[in-house]
Regions:
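Hydrophobic alpha/beta core scaffold segments
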Residues: 295-309, 320-330, 334, 339-423
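A charged, amphipathic alpha-helical module
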Residues: 2-69, 190, 194-317, 336
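Redox- and metal-dependent alpha/beta enzyme cores, enriched for Fe-S-associated oxidoreductases
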Residues: 75-76, 81-111, 277, 281-352
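Glycine-rich, highly charged phosphate/nucleotide-binding loops
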Residues: 115-133, 336-349
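Acidic/His-rich segments in extracytoplasmic proteins that coordinate ligands and/or metal ions
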Residues: 126-195
Length: 423
């Protein structure tokens, strides 16, 4: 742990005078970690989840290794067309998580606030903006984002486009779920195709795009089946694997690597032992850095996180033969688009599929969408027979504190569910 802290301080300090050196150090440190994921894997995890750790690290390294082939995206932007022109997508939430895991987030949060960014803005976005402003993040080829679910996107990506002076494309997703709105978004995605072809200099084959959408559909179907099968199984889990799935099941949809991960899950679950302890379904992001949460839910036979809503935000009910409409449908009918009730109902449905005994609604600092829906969520989950704990905190900024309260409230919740029955 001391090594990680020292590494983070070096990265933070170098950005003040030598941002290129800081970037090299960050890249080198992450490459070393990737070698560990590849050759010194955590044997407590299932093989699929070990593969996922390596896949996620590859995704975060690419913008540092080949920034000219990278595109900054918002988390729920469909990325199949970007993959088709050879761009590697990476997102604010994923990259900021890795900076936080490297204990290098504090200087970037402060940088963003010093530049006038509100303290109440999501800490993932502040960390990413600060890292860009201090020169740690290299210039991407372009930026593609959507207004879907997160209002911070509107500030962050316009600011980044102005800062880097790169082409930017915004996708407007209406609130209501209608055929007309699907068509409206599909037309924008056709414009995105033209945008990418113009700025990258490559042609996007519609037949190849259809193949990618077929792959995306299979991937989502595999993951849904896995979540159903794990209901009566014990799957050892840490706090980052559910987040990895939440990232890759969005920005890597359409890739063979992500489909391979879901295929491995289906093989692994066949060999998993019978369920042990209590199953917890997690709504929104996970404070992976929290010792209090780690103590209760990391590799514990008494209670495990069996799913995170970020990995199950859309259904595989689209037609790949109409690729633009298929991607548009994923966005318009996204579980976090529209009224909070849609999100809550999707969470209840997915929690029950995974055999959850209870759920945690994590009120991440600055996320109005989540904070505002908390009381309604508690009412609806408990009416559906699922006890729900509302837990406030920060998924990225460890200086947010509140560890004592987190430990007390989470411990009491699990004890109420019976998680301590074998003590």
């Amino acid at each position: 742990m001391q090594i990680i802290e020292t590494f983070g301080h070096y990265v933070e300090n170098l950005t003040n005078t030598k941002p290129d050196s800081a970037r090299w150090l960050l890249k080198t440190g992450w490459e070393a970690q990737n070698l560990k994921f590849r050759y010194m894997q955590d044997k407590r995890l299932m093989p699929a989840d070990r593969h996922l750790a390596n896949l996620m690290m590859d995704t975060m390294l690419r913008p540092l290794q080949k920034p000219e082939d990278s595109v900054i995206v918002s988390i729920f932007t469909p990325c199949e067309m970007m993959q088709e022109v050879g761009l590697h997508p990476y997102n604010v939430e994923g990259f900021s998580c890795y900076l936080s895991a490297s204990k290098a987030e504090r200087a970037f949060l402060q940088q963003a606030e010093n530049q006038g960014i509100a303290e109440t803005l999501c800490s993932y976005h502040k960390t990413f903006l600060g890292a860009a402003q201090k020169g740690l993040l290299p210039k991407p080829k372009c930026i593609v984002y959507t207004n879907l679910t997160c209002d911070a996107n509107l500030l962050t990506f316009r600011t980044l486009a102005d800062f880097y002076q790169v082409p930017v494309f915004a996708i407007d997703v209406p609130w209501n779920q209608t055929k007309e709105n699907v068509q409206y978004v599909a037309d924008q995605l056709r414009d995105l195709k033209v945008f990418l072809e113009k700025n990258i200099g490559k042609t996007i084959s519609e037949d190849r795009l259809k193949e990618r959408l077929v792959c995306s559909k299979r991937t989502l179907e595999n993951y849904r089946k896995y979540q159903q099968l794990r209901a009566d199984r014990y799957v050892p889990s840490d706090l980052v694997t559910p987040l990895y799935a939440g990232m890759t099941n969005n920005i890597l949809l359409g890739t063979a690597e992500e489909e391979k991960y879901t295929q491995m899950l289906l093989e692994d679950i066949k060999k998993a032992p019978a369920a042990k302890g209590k199953h917890i379904y997690w709504m929104h992001t996970i404070p992976f850095w929290s010792d209090a949460v780690r103590q209760e839910l990391c590799f514990s036979e008494k209670a495990q996180i069996v799913g995170c809503e970020l990995a199950e935000t859309c259904e595989p009910d689209f037609d790949p033969e109409n690729p633009f409409e298929a991607m548009a449908r994923r966005m318009v009918y996204h579980s976090l688009n529209g009224s909070a009730l849609r999100r809550i109902e999707a969470g209840i449905r997915h929690a029950k599929q995974a055999g959850a005994d209870g759920a945690v609604w994590f009120g991440h600092w600055g996320c109005k969408h989540t904070l505002g829906a908390a009381q309604l969520a508690k009412k609806k989950f408990e009416e559906a027979g699922l006890p729900l704990l509302i837990l406030d905190g920060d998924g990225c900024d460890r200086s947010h504190g509140g560890e004592g309260q987190t430990s007390t409230r989470l411990g009491a919740f699990l004890e109420m569910l019976g998680g301590a029955e074998n003590e």
